[in-house]
Amino acid sequence: MWILYAFGSALFAGLTAVLAKCGIRKTNSTVATAIRTIVVLAFSWLMVFIVGSQERLSAISEKTLLFLILSGLATGASWLCYFRALQIGDINKVVPVDKSSTVLTILLAVIFLHESLSIAKGAGIVLLAAGTYLMIEKKQSDGAAKAGSSWLLYAAGSAVFASLTSILGKIGISGVESNLGTAIRTGVVLVMSWMMVFVTGKGKLLRAVPKNELVFICLSGLATGGSWLCYYKALQDGPASVVAPIDKLSILVTILFSWLVFHEKLTKKSAAGLVAVVGGTLLMLL
């Protein structure tokens, strides 16, 4: 069953990237992140009360709570980097770099969670790394060219923090009902996101958010909520070194919709990279 949750997470995560891209064409990425986190938090707590897990709140241990908070901080940092990268770079390049966090996640899972690393997983890591390199070599669009290579730094930061999120989340979610754990860590992300808005002086931009972009920001929040609930349920029941690669298959959904919505096309080199990324991901499932 956890495999189905992992694939559900991938579907919603793929939609999240496209919806978020639609919502940050004019809206500041930090402001958009803070707004969408409100939606995710509301969605998460709604699920908590639907399944009745709020009664277990007092039973959460200090260790579990600590790792949930750390996971939330890592998630917040990953989001801030990711949506800034999406704002200034091509979605077809940003997403592969972000998804390369799978490599680091697996290595950390082997080191800290003592999960096994087979020959197939090792080959998958190599393919994933090679595919990511091929995809980020894709020709830049006019908008991305103006931004230079700064998108790559933000995308890489997103990948590092995302991998930490998976490991910290795996440790934290093991001692609490998955919906409740997701809701708690989302609260941490919310606080961090709004702190960044006001610390960077972006609060004045809240009133300038276009209504049509606000709709997409909220929809991306709902998609994120769905992805998180599926992901952490899968992470609770399944190994992180397998759940994470399945979740990263969201790249297929993202690239399909980026072609349909943003008309971003893949070159032969980047298409080969996509095949390598998907092939590497599937190898990790063996």
Whereabouts are the PLM-identified features?
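Structural signature of hydrophobic alpha-helical transmembrane segments
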Residues: 1-13, 58-75, 114-130, 156, ...
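Juxtamembrane helix-loop boundary signature in multi-pass membrane transporters
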Residues: 1-8, 103-160, 267-286
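Membrane-interface interhelical linkers
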Residues: 1-11, 20-68, 79-89, 137-154, ...
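Hydrophobic/small/kink-forming positions within alpha-helical transmembrane segments
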Residues: 10, 14, 18, 45, ...
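Hydrophobic/aromatic residues within transmembrane alpha-helices
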Residues: 23, 32, 85, 111-113, ...
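A helix-boundary/kink motif common to multi-pass secondary transporters
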Residues: 28-29, 90, 113, 117, ...
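Alpha-helical transmembrane segments of compact multi-pass small-molecule transporters, enriched
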Residues: 38-43, 97-111, 188-192, 246-260, ...
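Hydrophobic alpha-helical transmembrane segments in multi-pass integral membrane proteins
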Residues: 44-55, 105-118, 161-174, 223-240, ...
